[in-house]
Design a protein with these regions (language model features):
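A residue-level detector for the "anchor" residue at the start of short, highly conserved motifs
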Residues: 1-218
Length: 218
């Protein structure tokens, strides 16, 4: 449900935090390697096991680890990138390009890897880890955060979809902490700070690839 965070303990004692409208599939016990499937966003605190790898399968790519903490944002939306943020330890990112060639990227703590589903390519950069994982505590933390990233966090938390009609708005950055506040209250912050205008529509009124409520931004 929108705004809800749930926790799951896997058979190997790995802890998983699931963001709103996120789903994880895993066996009742791990026989060989530890494989799970994810749609949505989750934070993993993986129990170290030197004999078996832990793999997170998303519709676009895989993340492979031994024991570490990381965040994966892989909601089922073809227009959005899949993002993996490493908190500590190390992970390997496995994906195939448009020609079917396999690639492996080893990530370092503090890095975020963004996989473009259309181009089948990965961009790696440094992340504001506190902001990325703030959803675990029911918060949205913005620290000079770009509009695109701010809207991404709000979309994940409230199960909505923003359509920005004015590209000039992407020039703004935002700072603030929202805890247990309604979507309308958060939108008011953007209205007053950047003079944005919002139009909320029902997803049945126009085509939405996600089935979410659409919020147009002017």
């Amino acid at each position: 449900s929108a705004g809800m965070v749930s926790t799951v303990t896997l058979p190997d004692s790995t802890q998983v935090w699931l963001n709103s409208n996120s789903y994880i599939k895993y066996p009742t016990r791990f026989v060989a390697d530890r494989d799970v499937e994810l749609v949505g966003e989750a934070y993993f605190k993986v129990t170290r096991d030197g004999r078996t790898r832990f793999r997170v399968h998303t519709p676009a790519m895989q993340v492979e680890v031994m024991g570490t903490e990381f965040n994966v944002d892989a909601y089922d939306n073809p227009r959005r990138t899949v993002r993996t943020t490493l908190v500590n330890g190390s992970v390997n990112l496995l994906y195939s390009d448009n020609e079917g060639r396999g690639h492996v990227i080893e990530m370092m703590p503090g890095q975020c890897a963004s996989f473009d589903k259309t181009l089948k390519s990965v961009t790696v950069g440094m992340a504001d880890v506190e902001s990325v994982v703030s959803w675990r505590e029911g918060k949205i933390v913005l620290n000079r955060t770009s509009l695109a990233d701010a809207f991404r966090m709000i979309e994940n938390h409230f199960n909505v979809e923003f359509v920005v009609r004015n590209p000039m708005l992407y020039e703004h950055n935002f700072t603030g902490v929202f805890a247990d506040q309604s979507l309308e209250t958060i939108l008011d912050h953007f209205r007053y700070s950047s003079h944005m205008h919002f139009r909320r529509t029902d997803p049945r009124d126009r085509a939405s690839v996600t089935g979410r409520e659409i919020i147009e931004v002017y």
